[in-house]
Amino acid sequence: YCKNVNKALDEIVRVLKPGGVLVCSTYGSRHMQEISRLVSGYDKRIALEADKLFEKFGLDNGDKILKKHFSDVERRDYKDALVVDEAEPLVDYILSCHGNQKEYLVDKYTDFKKYVEKKLGKPMTITKEAGVCACRK
């Protein structure tokens, strides 16, 4: 979520004690892609992310960025998925995202919830593409 990843990493390297470890997590471009498709199916104008944060620092490029600042970078992918069978928690999650969805959904909450309930005729498996990197100077 920082604007200048390299500047933030420079500062972390500066203050990290000898023997210290930075552990950071991130996600990839396919993380929760089913939710984005679900929302887009309701209204194509909705974007759940204001910025594609995974493009600034994600699974596809994070270790390369970290290796510019740290001599030892170990990446571990976290294999996981989420199975959702209730509409209300999913709708609440969607409304909590950092995009423009509130602009289009707040006044249509009931209609959108019915749309999600219909789409959840059976449990939905949601891709979770995430991982962590452990970094040493």
What label would you give each PLM region?
Residues 6-7, 13, 19-82, 101-106:
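Conserved catalytic/acceptor-binding region of the Class I
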Residues 53-137:
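Conserved Class I S-adenosyl-L-methionine
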